[in-house]
Design a protein with these regions (language model features):
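Short alpha-helical segments that sit at the start of domains
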Residues: 1-26, 99-130
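A generic structural signal for ordered alpha-helices
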Residues: 1-2, 37, 91, 95, ...
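Residue-identity detector for threonine
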Residues: 4, 10, 19, 70-72, ...
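Generic serine detector
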Residues: 16-18, 77, 96, 151-153
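Winged helix-turn-helix DNA-binding recognition segment
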Residues: 30-74, 133-184
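Alpha-helix capping and helix-coil boundary motifs
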Residues: 72, 93-94, 118, 155
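Short, amphipathic alpha-helical interaction segments positioned at domain boundaries
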Residues: 80-116, 183-188
């Protein structure tokens, strides 16, 4: 997961929204070896993206994918796209591993947040979960801001929000090392 997040942070423009980044992640993990992807309508509704054209337009504008027209018949709901950046697909783990990763990205244990949470919150929780060992996590502050597409102050605000909403038990920034450390809340 970390590798895919890093590749996406590298190829997507810095100004890409959290929504577009979450969408790009699902596309990268669900694409076939030719870069073709179909995101079903149910998945898009679950991600709260059904009917939202802006994140797709962002990814098209970045020349990362091209949306393809889909049929309107029964069973044809969703969006089909062709990924244009084949580097995102290489090296491609087995399809079953990518499918599990795509599902985990929707519910990143141990830092899962509500599906109704704003995209920046969901993306940051996912990035933190990908950098969390069983009882603690840490990452370079600059890496986190790059992966989340946020400024340091925005990231600090989200860490504080995770404390208030009981997603995290604690966090601190080691200014000398440039690292952020956190501890997920243990649920019983």
């Amino acid at each position: 997961m970390r590798e895919t997040l890093n590749r996406l942070a590298t190829v997507l423009p810095r100004f890409s929204s959290s929504t577009a980044r979450l969408l790009a992640l699902q596309c990268a993990l669900r694409a076939d070896r030719h870069g073709q992807v179909h995101l079903p309508g149910g998945l898009l509704r679950g991600m709260r993206l059904a009917g939202h054209a802006v994140p797709w337009q962002e990814l098209e504008h970045a020349e990362w994918l091209r949306c393809r027209p889909t049929g309107t018949g029964k069973g044809q709901s969703g969006v089909e796209a062709q990924l244009l950046d084949t580097d995102t697909l290489m090296p491609a783990p087995a399809r079953s591993h990518r499918a599990r990763a795509a599902h985990w990205a929707l519910h990143p244990v141990p830092l899962a947040v509500a599906r109704a949470a704003p995209p920046a919150v969901r993306l940051t929780a996912l990035v933190l979960a990908a950098h969390t060992e069983p009882d603690a996590g840490r990452a370079d502050a600059e890496t986190l801001t790059h992966l989340c597409g946020l400024s340091q102050s925005q990231l600090d605000d989200l860490f504080d929000r995770f404390i208030r909403t009981k997603v995290l038990e604690a966090w601190h920034c080691d200014g000398d090392a440039g690292e952020i450390h956190w501890r997920p809340r243990v649920t019983e």
